[in-house]
Structures are given as C-alpha cells and as structure tokens.
Curated annotation (Swiss-Prot):
Domain of life: Eukaryota
Modified residues (Phosphoserine): S50, S309, S330, S345, S370
Domain writeup: The PAL motif is required for normal active site conformation. Substrates, such as NOTCH1 and APP peptides, are bound between PSEN1 transmembrane domains and via the first lumenal loop and the cytoplasmic loop between the sixth and seventh transmembrane domains. Substrate binding causes a conformation change and formation of an intermolecular antiparallel beta-sheet between PSEN1 and its substrates.
UniProt GO MF annotations: aspartic endopeptidase activity, intramembrane cleaving
Alphabetical list of InterPro entries matching this protein: Pept_A22A_PS1, Peptidase_A22A, Preselin/SPP, Presenilin_C
Membrane topology recorded in Swiss-Prot or TrEMBL: Multi-pass membrane protein
Processing and modification events after translation: Heterogeneous proteolytic processing generates N-terminal (NTF) and C-terminal (CTF) fragments of approximately 35 and 20 kDa, respectively. During apoptosis, the C-terminal fragment (CTF) is further cleaved by caspase-3 to produce the fragment, PS1-CTF12.
Protein name (Swiss-Prot/TrEMBL): Presenilin-1
Location of the region described as Disordered in the Swiss-Prot/TrEMBL record: 1-66, 304-335
C-alpha cells in the first residue's frame, strides 16, 4: 500500500505562531486590495468592497493556490518516486546477489508448515493440486493475521501489537541474521570464531531494535527495514515450492486489491481507524521515505488541526459572548468611530460577511496544514518489499541462471510501481502497490523465460543477427 506526499509547499519555519499566520494573511489581503484598487482606478470600473478587499479576490487566491499545488506535485512527486525506487531496488539487489552467490537459499531442505503439501509428485495434475492447496493455506494464514492485527488495533491493544512486532523483529535481526551471516561466511570461506560472530549479531540486532522501534537516524532505520525485508524474502524463496510461490504471488495481488479498496477491507479499515485517531502506524510495518505521517491517513497535520479547532472554539466563544453580553459592545477598546471613519476613507468600508470569514479561515487552515515538512512523504508497506523481492529472487533461482529473465522482472516491477504512483497522484487515495507490479512481473517472467529466451538461444545457435 502506497501513499503520496501532500502537494503543499515545504515551509522552513514550521513553528510559526498563530499571530504570524494572521498577520501574513492580512498582509496578503492588503497587497491584493491595493493591486485591485489601482486597476479599478486605472480602468474607471470600481468593484464593490467587502471586508476591505474585492469579493472575487478570495476565489483568485484559491485558484493561485491550486496552481501552486499542481507545480509542487510535479516537483516533489518525481522526487519521492525516485526516493521509493532506491530502497525497492536495493532490497531486490540484495536478494538477487544472495541467490546468485549463496547456494543455501536455492537448496530444497524442506517446506514451511503453512505449505504442507509437497510438489514432488508423479503427475502434473497432482503437483498443480498441491500447489493450489498450499497457496490457499498460506493466503488464509495471511488473511487471518491481517484481520487479527486490525482487531487488536481497533480495540487499542497496542501493547499486544508491539510485543508481536518486537518478537518478529528479534527473530529477523538475531536468528535469521545469524543464519544469513553464517552461510555467507561459508560461501566465501571466511573463518571467524563464535565470540566475534556473537558480538556482531548482538550489535546488529540491538541497534536495529532501537532504530526500528524507538529512535534513530532515518537512514539507519531505512537500512534495517530493507535488510529485514530481504531476509524475509530469502526465507520465502528457500522454503516455498516453485509452483506454490508463483500462485501465492498471483493470489496475494488480488487479495491486496480487495483488502485496500473494498469498504470493509482489513487494510482500509486499518487506514480509516488510524485516520480517525490521528495516529501513525507502527514503523516495523511501513517503510517511509522521510520522517513522515501517512498523508491519506490524516488529512492535515494533527497539531494544525488542534490549532484550527482552538481558533474555531475561540471564535465561537467570542460570538456567544457578543450575543449574551451586549454591554461589552460599547467598549470599543480604543477603536472609536473617528478611527473607523479614517480607516474607511483609506481602505473602504469594512463589512465582514460569512463568505469573507470562511475565506480567511480557509487561508489560515491551508497555511497551518502546510507547516510541517517532516510530516510529508511516501510510505510503502514492508510486505510489498518482500513480495517484490520474492518474485525477482524466484525468477533468478528458477530461470536456469538467466539474467534476461531476472532483469525483465526487475524492470517490470519498477514500471508497475511507477504506474501505481501515477494512479495515486490522480485518485489521491491509498492504493495497493502489489497488483500492477506483480502482474507485470509474472507476465514478463513467463514471457521472457518461455518465449524470449528460447528465441534468443535459437538465434545464437544458428548465428543469426537481428
């Protein structure tokens, strides 16, 4: 599941006070008023004033904001697409490099407990049936675990979710990393004592737990998330049978589509629940390109929403006090009738209407919503990293060492991811990241492995040049 960076400007001063916002709004209104008044004097065609400025200026400001949003979408959209391509590429490169060099992950030493049926059968029909049963069991486990996660999050069982994620991270960062490091040392014939290996694994795991579940530099957190995704993908590549793996990739794409887009889909319910609570998802589940908040999960900065709500409450209280206490209205606070007459002679009559107040409030909320640049960015689920890498790794392991098929799958996944982000920019809602990329990857794999590669072999055998 992917999210798009908010198409709003990145302000350097994210802690501007409310008075500064109001003063900036008034200053912009005065500039607009002076510009329009000069045009009217030049054309001799005056416009009615409302709240000291032309009535149509608010619409022009909104149109100008829309144009700036489109420009910033083009500017920052491509930047974040590249920022998402880099980690996906790194994860797939780690997996492919391991598959090509470490034979441990291509040997068939067993299967997962979720895939109990073997594919070493006498007939193709039995193998197909066993692969379908294995895929059904695996997808059922994924669906049940996803629903369990949504239920725990909906009922605020945060400690249970944290414990679940911490145990998973411990297994990946300590046990699977130890197995991976040991196999790499065996492959390259590196001699190392167990004490040194234990120190390496201890430091690697502890730093990873701190960076993922607590605090740490962004690049360090991203590196650990990429590494644990690659380790999980390698486990799937080793222990999933070939036909079962391809079938799981096809079915998981359909499930991802249903889970994200259906009104009662588990992932959509998770997003909507987080949006209602203005909460971020757990960092062990999501890769972020910046220190960000899921934009679709919170339609604005939570702090800004609190400020806006406080302003609205203040305005409501002021209105109520004005209606209930007419005596205080006689207290002009220094703004006498002479001052108002002098102001009207310079700026025109000051008439506050519902439309102008709404326009000013909208401008203030837009400024507040675009304050925090650290709350904008792209997020991609770690499951997407894992299944992208499983597809490329399986292609590398089962395509007879053919680099053409591996590269074709790699390019297909990036093309699908780019199209997904393009659709994300159009619809501006959370979209599943697996269907397009996995579909392209499967089509490219089978087309290259069974059509392109035999054709190229025949050309090379007969020494034909095209």
């Amino acid at each position: 599941m992917t999210e798009l960076p908010a198409p709003l400007s990145y302000f350097q001063n994210a802690q501007m006070s409310e008075d500064n916002h109001l003063s900036n709004t008034v200053r912009s209104q005065n500039d607009s008023r002076e510009q329009h008044s000069s045009e009217r004097r030049r054309r001799g065609n005056p416009e009615p004033l409302s709240n000291g400025r032309p009535q149509g200026s608010s619409h022009q400001v909104v149109e100008q904001d829309d144009e700036e949003d489109e420009e910033l979408t083009l500017k920052y959209g491509a930047k974040h697409v590249i920022m998402l391509f880099v980690p996906v590429t790194l994860c797939m490169v780690v997996v492919v490099a391991t598959i090509k060099s470490v034979s441990f992950y291509t040997r068939k030493d067993g299967q997962l407990i979720y895939t109990p049926f073997t594919e070493d059968t006498e007939t193709v029909g039995q193998r197909a049936l066993h692969s379908i049963l294995n895929a059904a069991i695996m997808i059922s486990v994924i669906v049940v675990m996803t629903i369990l996660l949504v239920v725990l999050y909906k009922y605020r069982c945060y400690k249970v979710i944290h414990a679940w994620l911490i145990i998973s991270s411990l297994l990946l960062l300590f046990l699977f990393s130890f197995i991976y490091l040991g196999e790499v040392f065996k492959t390259y014939n590196v001699a190392m004592d167990y004490i040194t290996v234990a120190l390496l694994i201890w430091n690697f795991g502890v730093v990873g737990m701190i960076a993922i579940h607590w605090k740490g530099p962004l690049r360090l957190q991203q590196a650990y998330l990429i590494m644990i995704s690659a380790l999980m993908a390698l486990v799937f590549i080793k222990y999933l049978p070939e036909w079962t793996a391809w079938l799981i990739l096809a079915v998981i794409s359909v499930y991802d589509l249903v889970a994200v887009l259906c009104p009662k889909g588990p992932l959509r319910m998770l997003v909507e629940t987080a949006q209602e609570r203005n909460e971020t998802l757990f960092p062990a589940l999501i890769y972020s390109s910046t220190m960000v908040w899921l934009v679709n999960m919170a339609e604005g900065d939570p702090e800004a929403q609190r400020k806006v709500s406080k302003n609205s409450n203040y305005n409501a209280q002021s209105t109520e006090s004005e209606t209930q206490d007419p005596v205080t209205e006689s207290d002009d606070g220094g703004f006498s009738e002479e001052w108002e007459a002098q102001r009207d002679s310079r700026l025109g009559p000051h008439h506050s209407t519902t439309e102008t107040r709404a326009a000013v409030q909208e401008l203030s909320s837009n400024i507040l919503a675009s304050e925090d640049p650290e709350e904008r960015g792209v997020k991609l689920g770690l499951g997407d990293f894992i299944f992208y890498s499983v597809l490329v790794g399986k292609a590398s392991a089962t395509a007879s060492g053919d680099w053409n098929t591996t590269i074709a799958c790699f390019v297909a996944i990036l093309i699908g991811l780019c199209l997904t982000l393009l659709l994300l920019a159009i619809f501006k809602k959370a979209l599943p990241a697996l269907p397009i990329s996995i579909t392209f990857g499967l089509v490219f794999y089978f087309a290259t492995d069974y059509l392109v590669q035999p054709f190229m072999d025949q050309l090379a055998f007969h020494q034909f040049y095209i």
